[in-house]
């Protein structure tokens, strides 16, 4: 019986189906939150735009590819979830919601972000994971209050040098990209607390010991020849994470000599397992 009902709903024309799903949502919820996640929406229900005091709007896991201009009426919105949809471009109306603090855009088909995103100067958290980004859009570097950036599972090869302007940034997730080298800009961001570069193509890690606020670095599933050196109390997740981060003097000398001769450094000397 349940399968029959699901099959019936699946074949209701789009407008009727949306009425069926959100038909009871006619008044502003007392908690100022609307959650339409997983509602099979193909078009945004316009009457939600009349809830001008709305603070949280969850539209995750639908079939949306556009948003109406009327969304600009939601000027009190602080959290907007658009992840797991079909957006190929971020609707510019989102950039008019200047009170946004958290924006979820993961699992879409985004290749870039509009310059207007810089208008969201209250944004603290931005999720861009599992899109089609081959570079981190420069506009991200203009979000001066950003504290958490999730850009994992894209096709990033480099990070822009301007990223160091984000002095409030504390957590950056870059797992599942195409980084061949540890991003040098991160070495100039001593305020970072969490760095995740899991599942990339990084072969050598520079010392991170000077990043005095660092608490966690995740570097597993890289073809690395060494573990990153970190300060006392910093947790490492990855190969050789339990080994001492202090370099063996012999290894340091051999590495320096190989570098002078423009040769590939020899494999690191690891402590024996005994």
Curated annotation (Swiss-Prot):
InterPro entries found in the cross-reference section: Leu-rich_rpt, Leu-rich_rpt_typical-subtyp, LRR_dom_sf, LRR_domain-containing
Presence of keyword Phosphoprotein: no
Each LRR repeat, start to end: 30-51, 52-74, 76-97, 98-120, 121-143, 145-166, 167-189, 191-213
Cellular localization per UniProt: Nucleus
Record field: compositional bias (Pro residues): 264-274
Residues covered by region (Disordered): 236-274
Taxonomic superkingdom: Eukaryota
Single biological process term from Gene Ontology: cardiac muscle cell development
KW Nucleus (keyword) present: yes
SUPFAM superfamilies per the UniProt record, alphabetical: L domain-like
Residue ranges with Basic and acidic residues bias: 239-250
Protein name, as recorded: Leucine-rich repeat-containing protein 10
Gene this protein is translated from: Lrrc10
Tissue distribution: Detected specifically in the heart.
GO cellular component: cytoskeleton; mitochondrion; myofibril; nucleus; sarcomere
Entries under SMART domains matching the protein: LRR_BAC, LRR_TYP
Task performed by this protein: May play important roles in cardiac development and/or cardiac function.
Annotated PANTHER family: LEUCINE-RICH REPEAT-CONTAINING PROTEIN 10B, PTHR48051
Primary subcellular site in the record, as a coarse category: nucleus
Molecular function GO labels: actin binding; alpha-actinin binding
Disulfide bonds: none
